Structures are given as C-alpha cells and as structure tokens.
Amino acid sequence: MSTFILGATGLVGSQIVKVAESSPAIKSITTLTRRTPDFANSSSKLKTLEESDSSKWSEIIKSQAVSSDVYLSAFGTTRAKAGSAENFKKIDYGINYSSAKAAKENGSKVCVLVSSMGANASSPFLYMKTKGELEDDIIKLGFDHTVILRPGALLGERKESHGLGNSIAQTIGNWTKGTWLQGLLKPIDASDVGKVAIDFAQKGINGELKDKVIIVGGDDLVKLANSLN
C-alpha cells in the first residue's frame, strides 16, 4: 500500500508519518511540505517533496508518476496564523480541496481527512464553517472511501503555535482527560489520531470498509484509538 500525506510537519500529520513508517503494510510514503521535515531520510520507504509555495501543491501531486493508494491530509491553519479570514479560507479550504482533487484525479482510492469537532458548513463560526465546507466538497470528489476524523482538543507537543485559542483548548484538554469533564472537549493525543487514520487507510485498501463515507466524531475517535492501543 502506498500513501500520500499532506500536513506532515504538523501535530497530527507528523504522527501519521510515524505510524505509516512502522506499518509493514505500507510500502511507500510520500509527503509534501513547505520546508524540509525533521523526518527526512528517516526511512527508506519515505519520499519527501518540498515546495514553499503551497498554491503549486496540486500540480505537484498530479505530476507524480505513480499514484498513491491513499491520500491523507492533516493540513490546516488558524485565522490568527493566516492573518485574515480570507487567507484562512484560501489555505484551509483552498489548498486542502485542490490537493485532494489532484490526488483523486491521479488515482488515489481512499481519502482520510483530519477535520475538527463541530465542523459544519452551516456554522456561524468561520473555523467550523470552513471545515464543514471542506468536508462536504471532498466527499463530492467521489473517492472509493472517504474517511473524515473529527477530533476534539488535540494533545501533544506542537512545534509551532496555533494561536491562543488552541493553546487554551490543549491546556484544558490535558486537565480534563480521564475525568468526567473530558466529554466537553473530547481530548485525544495526536499520536492516537495518527493510529486511527492509518488503520482506516489500511482497511479502505483491504476492502474492509463497507461505507463509502465514514465520519468519526470525538467520542468514537477516542474509543477507536483505545481499541488500537
């Protein structure tokens, strides 16, 4: 099985790479990032592509001589990091959608998208609305299987700040994990999201998924992660 991973230097994406590297079922891993990742040359089955201009990513994906069986994306940003609502949508929706479309056109059969708890195209909140619109439009691309993961507060060490809101959510998530309060933020370790993402990727290629579209919310994501640990 071959995989293509977008957002591989982020909190969740880097964990997806780690799990993929350790999986004997995965024979090749391709990542596309803006800068040289820390894991470059960490595995013989890993190929890293670099392009600082993310608007060119879809063309790079389409130019790959051999398509990847599975396209996984944990790519995303925040309004604070993007600088404006317009830039946020251009990056979080635009780059994600064009890259997924390119992967589908290049022959990928399964798409695993790491989205967010509360994603809804009808939401009055920019972040949730954009995530929901992205989900809806990626589903319309018609992969053999589209798996959408909606984690709650992500736990783990970030290399870059994603803004005060994310920092607060992560701190509270750490405090509430394992208590009755965890139902509010549904905290989950990024490494566990990585495990679930790769598990779904493998099941999709192996013919073990019955549904064409699978959406996994925070509670179910935690349960699935626990079953894999």
UniProtKB/Swiss-Prot annotation:
The keyword Protease does not apply. One of its GO terms (biological process) is import into nucleus. Its main location: mitochondrion. It is a peripheral membrane protein. It is found in: Mitochondrion outer membrane. Disulfide bonds: none annotated. The keyword Chloroplast does not apply. GO terms for cellular component: cytoplasm; mitochondrial outer membrane. Keywords: Membrane, Mitochondrion, Mitochondrion outer membrane, Transit peptide. Residues 1-36 form a transit peptide. Belongs to the FMP52 family. This is Protein FMP52, mitochondrial. It comes from Candida albicans (strain SC5314 / ATCC MYA-2876). The gene is FMP52.
